[in-house]
């Protein structure tokens, strides 16, 4: 009997939490660029009783993503795909961020869109930064949504992006657009695709950002939010479980903002939770 396959791309804090929440009774295919972290995570989950297969991947290379999608299909019915892999401004240059966070998402949507099982669902982990990006004109948004993945990084306006922070927010806005555009193709396979935009989450990447140059601003945003706290990987795993599950059967091509109210406070000038 064919097993259902959960694919988790990116095994950082959120990826691990999602794998634990969703993986019981499924074959779990873990993928990451960092083979040392990938191996340690796979071994840890196996020790907890999960059925785990590990595969290295470079999400910025189509051949690598295609091979991962093919591997997933060989393991069983690909019913759940979660893409968490990404780089942040403190970790990489603008060019690297665009290659991983923009092109990587586009490649995952295309390659897994051809193997996802009917009734399956996918979630792309984006960021609240996508809501804070500098405005794009309609032509730029159409280009980010519909340009073939292999041509994305050649868009002329992307050549002007030299700041990691700008590249990150633009890539995350593009994630929303690519998910919207991909929802039709996924729907024709009887599957759904959505994204989640976390706020500041207590993961290794999140803590790196808090320790970086923008940490003070990030803490200020948290203080003025409704929740008044950092998010946890479990918060994101819970939102992911909803979007992968039957209660969201009529939800596709949309983004779920899970930021504790940061964007709402920024847009409305709301007083802090502690006020």
Regions found by a protein language model. Give the residues of each.
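Short, small/polar-rich loop/turn modules that mediate ligand/substrate recognition or access, typified
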Residues: 192, 251-253
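Rossmann-fold cofactor-recognition segment
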Residues: 45-63
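Canonical Rossmann dinucleotide-binding motif of NAD(H)/NADP(H)-dependent dehydrogenases/reductases
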Residues: 1-29, 33
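Conserved NAD(P)H cofactor-binding loop of Rossmann-fold oxidoreductase domains
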Residues: 82-90, 100, 126, 261
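Conserved Rossmann-fold cofactor-binding substructure of NAD(P)-dependent oxidoreductases
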Residues: 60-76
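Catalytic loop of short-chain dehydrogenase/reductase
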Residues: 89-91, 118-189, 200
């Amino acid at each position: 009997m064919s097993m259902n396959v959960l694919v988790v791309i990116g095994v950082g804090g959120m990826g691990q939490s999602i794998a634990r929440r969703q993986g019981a009774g499924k074959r779990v295919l873990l993928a990451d660029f960092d083979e040392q972290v990938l191996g340690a995570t796979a071994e840890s989950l196996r020790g907890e009783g999960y059925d785990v297969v590990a595969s290295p991947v470079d999400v910025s290379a189509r051949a690598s993503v295609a091979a991962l999608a093919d591997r997933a299909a060989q393991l069983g019915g690909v019913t759940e795909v979660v893409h968490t892999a990404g780089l942040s401004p403190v970790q990489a240059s603008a060019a690297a961020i665009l290659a991983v966070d923009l092109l990587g998402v586009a490649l995952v949507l295309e390659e897994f869109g051809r193997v996802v099982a009917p009734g399956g669902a996918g979630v792309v982990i984006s960021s609240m930064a996508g809501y804070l990006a500098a405005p794009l004109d309609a032509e730029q948004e159409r280009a980010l949504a519909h340009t073939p993945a292999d041509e994305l990084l050649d868009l002329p306006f992307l050549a002007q992006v030299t700041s990691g922070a700008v590249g990150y927010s633009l890539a995350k806005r593009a994630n929303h657009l690519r998910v919207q555009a991909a929802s039709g193709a996924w729907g024709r396979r009887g599957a759904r695709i959505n994204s989640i935009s976390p706020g500041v989450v207590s993961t290794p990447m999140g803590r790196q950002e808090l320790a970086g140059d923008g940490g003070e601003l990030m803490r200020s945003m948290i203080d003025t939010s409704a929740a008044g706290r950092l998010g946890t990987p479990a918060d994101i795993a819970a939102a992911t479980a909803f979007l992968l599950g039957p209660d969201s059967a009529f939800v596709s091509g949309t983004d779920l903002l899970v930021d504790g109210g940061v964007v709402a406070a920024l847009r409305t000038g709301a007083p802090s939770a502690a006020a």
